[in-house]
Regions:
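Transcription/chromatin regulatory elements, primarily intrinsically disordered
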Residues: 163-179
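Conserved small/polar residues in nucleotide/adenosyl-binding loops
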Residues: 198-204
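Long, charge-rich alpha-helical interaction segments
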Residues: 189-192
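Helical scaffold of the NTase/Pol beta-like nucleotidyltransferase catalytic core
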Residues: 1-40
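Aromatic- and glycine-enriched beta-alpha-beta binding-site module
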Residues: 57-97
Length: 204
């Protein structure tokens, strides 16, 4: 059974992760000439992080690169490796490298009961951000457009501005417990879309 992580318990891990990620941004620019920013994602952005029965939870963030040299764009696997190594060098023994997932690098905390799932985004020539992913069949590294991510952020803002956060929190937790095998971000997106139907004005 999933439950929400309270703000007090969440504040320490979030601060710890964000300090490391901000240093990661500095290192990537100083060492590789790559400009980036950090973006909390989904339930982290809306402070609706859930923990399982053992108290374990995930924190989802993206590192968003707005400037990437062409030689780096031509070696996406190498970019992912650079991000992972730089994070490892900064975090030291606090985190260890877990398994690599399709769209994120998972870092597991060595002492606390939580993970960091870090996505890598790169801005393309059209000014849109694309996510660096690994194709599960071919094992090739690719860039996929992420319109859903920014669409969800706009919907969240609308829901929160129309006093719909409690409804979103209730629905997300209900669906999370109903479908524990499903990826949390997609459950969250579904909850956002459902809540939007109730908060949007009805057509006349």
């Amino acid at each position: 059974m999933y439950t929400y992580v309270g703000k007090k318990r969440l504040s320490g891990p979030k601060a710890e992760v964000e300090d490391i990620l901000e240093e990661l941004v500095d290192v990537m620019e100083e060492k590789y000439g790559m400009k980036a920013s950090i973006m909390p994602v989904g339930s982290v952005r809306s402070n609706l992080v859930t923990a399982d029965e053992d108290g374990h939870f995930d924190l989802d963030y993206n590192i968003c690169f707005s400037k990437v040299p062409q030689d780096v764009r031509n070696n996406l696997q190498g970019l992912r490796g650079r991000v992972r190594k730089a994070f490892d060098d900064i975090a030291g023994d606090l985190f260890f490298y877990g398994r690599e997932r399709k769209s994120v690098i998972r870092f597991e905390h060595s002492e606390e009961s939580y993970n960091l799932d870090l996505g890598i985004l790169i801005r393309n020539n059209n000014g849109q951000y694309c996510r660096l992913v690994v194709d599960r069949k071919s094992r090739e590294y690719q860039l996929n457009e992420i319109a859903l991510l920014y669409d969800a952020s706009k919907k969240e803002d609308y829901i929160f501005s129309h006093n719909g956060k409690d409804q979103l929190a209730s629905l997300y937790l209900k669906n999370k417990n109903k479908h524990p095998e499903t990826d949390s971000f997609h459950i969250y997106l579904e909850a956002v879309n459902t809540c939007l139907l109730y908060t949007s004005p009805s057509p006349r």
